[in-house]
């Protein structure tokens, strides 16, 4: 599934939710950071098959500048992968940014 998400993101087959736009401004995460992270060495760390707006997953990745990001997105079976939210994970709440403490 990770490869399918990366493939869609790399070919522009994704969209941002209003929530992610609002939250990235508040959290000082640039849109280009989200785009580069989702297309790089990303890893699905949590799966939400029963999410209320449709199946989604939490992806961990690192930007080109080395910033860790968590990106929640829809499953790639939609025509466009929807980026739901993105944030820099708190190292005190995550082990290696991949496992919840």
Segments predicted by a language model, with ranges:
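Ribonuclease/tRNase effector modules and their secretory precursors
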Residues: 1-101
